[in-house]
Amino acid sequence: MDVLSCSINTLKGLYDISGVEVGQHFYWQIGGGQVHGQVLITSWVVIAILLGSATIAVRNPQTIPTGGQNFFEYVLEFIRDVSKTQIGEEYGPWVPFIGTIFLFIFVSNWSGALLPWKIIQLPHGELAAPTNDINTTVALALLTSLAYFYAGLSKKGLGYFGKYIQPTPILLPINILEDFTKPLSLSFRLFGNILADELVVVVLVSLVPSVVPIPVMLLGLFTSGIQALIFATLAAAYIGESMEGHH
């Protein structure tokens, strides 16, 4: 009962976290509920950038890749290497998932560092990078959790749950709690870093001439890429861990 109540409280905590707001948000009223409009708008922009870039790069594929095709093949090879390193020889089916996570977070983070979302005037609220909203990072973390549960169950069936009593049944509560804290650590790490970067850039732009914040923006681009890589690497590591059945 203690483990069950702890798990329920953790899930309730994730729901409560979704109400955290930084800045002025605006909402769409749909039925009896509210939808975070600013997250959807900026997410659609990021998705459009990814789809548009991929379409342009591969619309006329060449045997010997050049230009955009060469760049995207390099990105694909990089994602494959990350997936294979963390998951192992059965990495193939997980490359699309890891790649989607990495590219979405990478472009979202860079949009926060390059695009002045908060300067765009809206009737109500303000825009920000998708990963600047705790709802986005929690959703990505929960998707990762579902992925590694699915990976473990598809590989081992119900025997997957045997990992919770290894190496000793005494660790059952800790092992269960660990699976619920992974989404929290993933989401807070990404949310905190991107939020801090955006706030620093906005403050500097409002206080000093435009040329001064450039070094900070360049640092933000670097850290944004690192955060995307960390998230994707940990997601792949969790999936590989669930398939291997060890910690």
Curated annotation (Swiss-Prot):
Keyword list (alphabetical) reads: ATP synthesis, CF(0), Chloroplast, Hydrogen ion transport, Ion transport, Membrane, Plastid, Thylakoid, Transmembrane, Transmembrane helix, Transport
Membrane spanning residue stretches:
38-58, 95-115, 134-154, 199-219, 220-240
Q: Has the keyword Ion transport been applied to this entry?
A: yes
One GO term describing the cellular component: plasma membrane
Topology versus the membrane: Multi-pass membrane protein
Question: Could you give the subunit structure recorded for this chain?
Answer: F-type ATPases have 2 components, CF(1) - the catalytic core - and CF(0) - the membrane proton channel. CF(1) has five subunits: alpha(3), beta(3), gamma(1), delta(1), epsilon(1). CF(0) has four main subunits: a, b, b' and c.
| Family, per entry | Belongs to the ATPase A chain family.
Task of the protein: Key component of the proton channel; it plays a direct role in the translocation of protons across the membrane.
Please state what the protein is called.
ATP synthase subunit a, chloroplastic
**Encoding gene, per UniProt annotation:** atpI
